[in-house]
Amino acid sequence: MLAKPYRLRKRQDFTAVYQQGKRWNSSHLALRTYPRRRSALALDGVKQSALNSREPPRIGISISQKVSKRAVVRNRIKRQLRAILRGLLPYLQPGWDLVIVVRPTAVECDYQQFLQELKQLLSEAEILHGY
């Protein structure tokens, strides 16, 4: 499980990422990204970019029953993705909301394939640095 500050949990946050974010695709995963914004007014005279740079990235994983009818399979995939993300957290740009969408073809993937595809997607989105 990811630590609480790194989790994307509210429906409105997922909706914002889906509707306004950008999308990158691979054969087994899709990555949606959206830069997080606070209110238009900067707090205590702090610039907006500086404020966002302190906020950790928030990540959500979306996996539907189309991937597998069996919850055991879906949960295994989510556990693998969360383990990969825990290792990549220090290298992720702060201030972003990310949603990883798992495609039905991901059932036959193993950990290494998920790791490779996730690194590739995060690099293409320019959210992964120093890795």
UniProtKB/Swiss-Prot annotation:
GO annotation, cellular component aspect: ribonuclease P complex
Keywords recorded for this protein, A-Z? Endonuclease, Hydrolase, Nuclease, RNA-binding, tRNA processing
**E.C. designation(s):** 3.1.26.5
Q: Which reaction does it catalyse?
A: Endonucleolytic cleavage of RNA, removing 5'-extranucleotides from tRNA precursor
Q: Which Pfam families match?
A: Ribonuclease_P
Q: Which GO terms describe its biological process?
A: tRNA 5'-leader removal
Q: Which InterPro entries match?
A: Ribosomal_Su5_D2-typ_SF, Ribsml_uS5_D2-typ_fold_subgr, RNase_P, RNase_P_CS
Q: Which domain of life is it from?
A: Bacteria
Which terms does the record give in the GO molecular function aspect? Answer: 3'-tRNA processing endoribonuclease activity; ribonuclease P activity; tRNA binding
SUPFAM superfamilies associated with the record: Ribosomal protein S5 domain 2-like
Q: How does it assemble?
A: Consists of a catalytic RNA component (M1 or rnpB) and a protein subunit.
Free-text function comment from the UniProt entry: RNaseP catalyzes the removal of the 5'-leader sequence from pre-tRNA to produce the mature 5'-terminus. It can also cleave other RNA substrates such as 4.5S RNA. The protein component plays an auxiliary but essential role in vivo by binding to the 5'-leader sequence and broadening the substrate specificity of the ribozyme.
As for family, the record states:
Belongs to the RnpA family.
**PANTHER family, per this entry?**
RIBONUCLEASE P PROTEIN COMPONENT (PTHR33992:SF1)
Protein name from the UniProt record: Ribonuclease P protein component
Query: What gene name is given for the protein in this entry?
Result: rnpA
